C-alpha cells in the first residue's frame, strides 16, 4: 500500500520542486507515454509517477484509463471533469457492457453497523463527543436491524443521515487536530465511507432503492443502491462532445441504451465480423474456469497449456481431454 506522506515516501518529498523539469523532459523526448516510460522518468527525477502522469495528460491527444477516472464521483479527474467544465472530448468506451454494473457500484454506497462499533471502540478513550455520536448512530442502525429479518426496503432514512452528518463533522475536526493516533487508518477509512454515504444520499431519487440486509459475514448493512445509473452516467458524458460505446455483447441493445445514458436519440450500429464463419473452429476445454474461486496456479497452468497447444500445433492434431 502506498503512503503519500512526504516523511515516508521519497517520491512525495520535494515532488513539486522537481516535477516541472520531469514533465518538460518527458514531453521533449517521448510521443508515446506508456506505463514503463512514465515510471522510468518518475524514478529518474524522484517524483510521484501518478501525479506526473496526471500533469502530462494535459498535453496528450489520447488518454487511456479506467472507467472510474471519468465516472466515479470520488476519483474522477477534476482537472478535466470538474463541475462546470466541458471539454472538447470524445469518449471511446470499450467493453461498455461492464459499465452498467460498474456504474451501479460507483453510484451506490453502504453503511455497516459493525464498522461503527469498531470505530467507537477506538475513539472511546480519545473523544467522548465522537463516541457519543457513534453511539447514536449505532442505536439508529440497531432499530433498522430489528425491522430486518433478511432484507428490508426503507422509503427514507432521515434520522440516520442527520446523525451521520454530525458524526462526520466531529471526526473531521478531530483528525485535523490529531494527525497521528493508534487506529487512525481504521477511523480514516470509516470517515471516507461515511462521507461517500452522505454524498451518494444527495443523489438518491426514483432511480435508487434504500434497503437493509445481513451480508455474507453476518454484518448488518444499509445500502443506497443505484438501480438505474443512466442519469448519473449522463452527467459525466455531458462533459464531452460525444461518446461511442463498444462491446461484442451489448445485447439486448435497448437495455444498454436505457441504462448507459438517459438520452432517447442514441443509435446503435451493428458491425459484422471480418472473419469468415466457415473458418471458425470452436474448441471447449471444460476442465478449466475463469471463475474467481478457481483462480489458482494450477488453473492458470491448464489454461496456459491450452493456449500453447493451440498456437503451436495444427488444429487437426489438437486433442482435448
Predicted feature residues:
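Charged, amphipathic alpha-helical oligomerization/scaffolding segments
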Residues: 91, 136, 159, 163-166, ...
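Signature of the SF2 helicase/ATPase Hel1-core->accessory helical subdomain module
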Residues: 45, 50-62, 67-162, 250-258
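A substrate-engagement module of RecA-like helicase motors
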Residues: 1-63, 71, 139-143, 147-154, ...
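Gly-rich Lys/Arg/Thr-decorated short loops/hinges at beta-loop-alpha junctions or inter-strand turns
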Residues: 33-35, 279-292, 311
Amino acid at each position: 500500500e502506498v503512503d503519500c506522506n512526504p516523511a515516508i515516501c521519497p517520491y512525495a518529498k520535494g515532488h513539486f520542486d522537481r516535477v516541472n523539469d520531469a514533465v518538460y523532459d518527458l514531453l521533449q523526448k517521448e510521443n508515446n507515454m506508456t506505463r514503463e516510460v512514465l515510471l522510468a522518468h518518475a524514478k529518474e527525477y524522484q517524483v510521484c509517477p501518478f501525479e506526473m502522469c496526471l500533469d502530462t495528460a494535459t498535453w496528450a491527444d489520447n488518454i487511456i484509463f479506467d472507467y472510474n477516472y471519468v465516472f466515479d464521483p470520488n476519483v474522477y479527474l477534476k482537472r478535466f471533469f470538474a463541475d462546470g467544465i466541458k471539454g472538447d472530448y470524445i469518449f471511446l468506451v470499450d467493453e461498455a457492457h461492464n459499465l452498467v454494473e460498474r456504474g451501479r457500484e460507483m453510484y451506490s454506497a453502504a453503511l455497516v453497523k459493525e464498522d461503527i462499533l469498531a470505530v467507537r471502540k477506538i475513539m472511546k478513550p480519545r473523544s467522548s463527543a465522537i463516541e457519543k455520536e457513534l453511539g447514536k448512530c449505532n442505536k439508529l442502525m440497531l432499530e433498522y436491524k430489528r425491522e430486518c429479518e433478511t432484507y428490508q426496503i426503507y422509503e427514507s432514512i432521515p434520522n440516520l443521515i442527520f446523525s451521520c452528518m454530525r458524526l462526520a463533522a466531529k471526526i473531521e475536526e478531530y483528525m485535523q487536530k490529531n494527525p497521528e493516533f493508534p487506529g487512525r487508518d481504521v477511523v480514516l477509512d470509516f470517515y471516507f465511507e461515511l462521507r461517500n454515504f452522505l454524498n451518494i444520499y444527495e443523489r438518491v431519487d426514483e432511480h435508487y432503492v434504500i434497503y437493509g440486509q445481513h451480508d455474507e459475514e453476518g454484518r448488518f448493512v444499509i445500502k443506497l443502491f443505484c438501480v438505474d445509473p443512466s442519469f448519473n452516467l449522463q452527467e459525466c458524458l455531458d462533459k464531452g462532445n460525444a461518446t461511442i460505446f463498444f462491446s461484442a455483447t451489448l445485447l439486448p441493445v435497448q437495455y444498454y441504451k436505457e441504462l448507459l445514458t438517459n438520452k432517447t436519440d442514441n443509435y446503435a450500429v451493428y458491425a459484422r465480423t471480418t472473419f469468415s464463419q466457415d473458418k471458425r473452429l470452436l474448441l471447449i476445454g471444460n476442465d478449466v474456469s475463469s471463475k474467481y474461486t478457481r483462480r489458482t496456479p494450477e488453473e492458470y497452468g491448464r489454461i496456459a497449456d491450452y493456449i500453447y497447444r493451440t498456437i503451436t500445433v495444427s488444429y487437426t492434431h489438437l486433442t482435448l481431454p
